[in-house]
Amino acid sequence: MTILKWALIFLLVSIVAGVLGFTGISAASADIARFLFYVFVVIFLVLLILGLTIFRA
């Protein structure tokens, strides 16, 4: 859950920076948020597949 929380924090930083006119910082933090979200999704899917197949009791 920590990766998702950091992705949301970077998303909020991106929105605030965009509203204040810092477009470079906004784009960079949006890219970081997108990357962290994709990492979260990949980890979630891997653990879901492992839970449904290998670790079935």
Swiss-Prot record:
Cross-referenced Pfam families, in alphabetical order? DUF1328
Say yes or no: keyword Cell membrane present.
yes
Q: How does it sit in the membrane?
A: Multi-pass membrane protein
| Main localization of the protein described in the UniProt heading | membrane
Q: From the record, give the transmembrane residue ranges.
A: 6-26, 35-55
UniProt keyword annotations, A-Z: Cell membrane, Membrane, Transmembrane, Transmembrane helix
Q: Which InterPro entries match?
A: DUF1328
Q: Name one GO cellular component term.
A: plasma membrane
Localization recorded for this chain is: Cell membrane
Family under the similarity heading: Belongs to the UPF0391 family.
- What protein name applies here? UPF0391 membrane protein bsl5717
High-level lineage: Bacteria, Pseudomonadati, Pseudomonadota, Alphaproteobacteria, Hyphomicrobiales
